[in-house]
């Protein structure tokens, strides 16, 4: 194989290695973001369930929380 052929193969190998490292970083960041989203959803869901149970006992709708306490109303605005 000529010197030019070896140089071309080496260049292709270097380009492949560089792009594979970039993809790994993006994949890792995507997985980390997905874990954070799952944690937020589980926390939000638990809070919503508590609020819904509290307001259902009073025959009202849960409109979220104010200062850590469930906010109940007949109709939620906003």
Curated annotation (Swiss-Prot):
Secretion signal span: 1-24
| Top-level division of the source organism's lineage | Eukaryota
Q: Which InterPro entries match?
A: Conotoxin (IPR004214)
How is this protein annotated for GO cellular component? extracellular region
- Give expression by tissue: Expressed by the venom duct.
An MF annotation (GO) of this entry:
toxin activity
The compartments listed are:
Secreted
Q: Which residues does the record list as Phenylalanine amide (modified residue)? A: 77
The record ties this protein, via Pfam families, to: Conotoxin (PF02950)
Propeptide positions, renumbered to this chain?
Answer: 25-44
Q: Name which cysteines form disulfide bonds.
A: 51-63, 55-72, 62-76
Q: Which family does it belong to?
A: Belongs to the conotoxin O3 superfamily.
Q: What name goes with this protein?
A: Conotoxin TsMSGL-11
The protein's organism comes out as Conus tessulatus
**Organism lineage string:** Eukaryota, Metazoa, Spiralia, Lophotrochozoa, Mollusca
